[in-house]
Each structure stands twice: as structure tokens, then as C-alpha cells.
Amino acid sequence: MELQFKNVTKAYGDVHAVDHVTHSMEKGVYGLLGVNGAGKTTLMRMLCTAINPTSGEILWNGKDIFSLGASYRGILGYLPQNYGFYPDLSVYDYMMYIASIKGLRPIVAKKRALKLLEQVGMAEKRKKKMRTLSGGMIRRVGIAQAMLNDPRILVLDEPTAGLDPNERIRFRNLVSELSEDRLVLLSTHIVSDVEYVANEIILMKEGKFFY
């Protein structure tokens, strides 16, 4: 299990949002720390194949992630900073909807959804409408949906944004629990989000990595 960034750059005109990033990651939790505008989200969107790098390569076990296509996306779980959901769906129905998008068979999806909702402390809220949930609850459902396909790579972009201190602690504990046997990349501008759970912390500033 190895993820490699090789001279990865994303340029918008003369601005380098990500600037020649080179790094290797294996199993564990990696904290990507930086202020808003440092390039974290751009890097994560490339990692999730939402946008292409201007130059450089991102490799999974030695193969370019963009050439791997659907097989790569099948081992990827992603929680964006602002993820969309249908407010009138129940928590359970939302999970089943995402499971169908990810191609899970209904019998597998049902078991997986119920297990994950239990794991994130949302089983008792599974019949509640998404629009009735607090910010912390929405983030917990968010990480549950990202885990539906049992991903090898879990990407969390500013997962504690807008949460109170108690919810941040709960979320950190959850990330630690879910990190076994997978690679977790967690981006944040809050030091405490990563200092207790990350195996390695990388500072990102003006599109570059600092160690």
C-alpha cells in the first residue's frame, strides 16, 4: 500500500495552487496542516481525480491514479469540506442512495450502512431527516458515507470545520478508530485535529510541503 506524489503541480495561470509536491505515504494517518488557501483542497481534489494536475504524477502502488480509473475510485473514500446531501432524505435512505452510486449490492449496502451508522453513533438517528441534524451529526454521517465501500484511501477535507470542541474530539477519536489498515489523509487548519491522531504531520504553505 503506497501513495506517491511525484512533482505534482496545479497551476491556474501564473498561480501555483500546488507547487511541485513530492511525497510518499503508506498505511496510517497523515495530517495536512495549513491555512485556508494553502493548496490543501486542490491537492485533495487531484487525489480524488476530480481535477487533473498540470504536471507531475500521483501513483497508487506504482500506477497512475488517472489511468486506473474506476478501479482506483473503488478504493477511495472522500469527505469534502462541503458535501451535498438531499435534506428530505432520512439518514438511512441517504446512506443507501450513496451506496447505490458506489455500486454496492442492496444486501451488502444495508448491512454496511447499519454497521457504519452504529460505528459513528448515528444508528438511533437513522430515521431522522438529514435537514434536522446538527453540524456534528452531518459530519458523522459524512464519514460514514465515505466508508461505505471500505476504502483503502480515506480523504477528509477540513472534517471538523464548524464543529464545537466536544464534537471535534469525538471526530478525532472516530478517525483514529477508522484508520486501521488504511491510509487516511486529513487536511485541516486546526493543529489539535491532527496532533493526537496523525502518524505524520505535513505543513502546507503556498502550495508546497514543509516538514
Please name every model-derived segment:
Residues M96, S100, I107-K125:
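Conserved ABC ATPase "signature" region
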Residues K129-L133:
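Conserved ABC ATPase signature
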Residues V35-G39:
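Walker A (P-loop) phosphate-binding loop of ABC-type ATPase nucleotide-binding domains
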Residues L154-D157:
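Catalytic Walker B motif of ABC-type/P-loop ATPase nucleotide-binding domains
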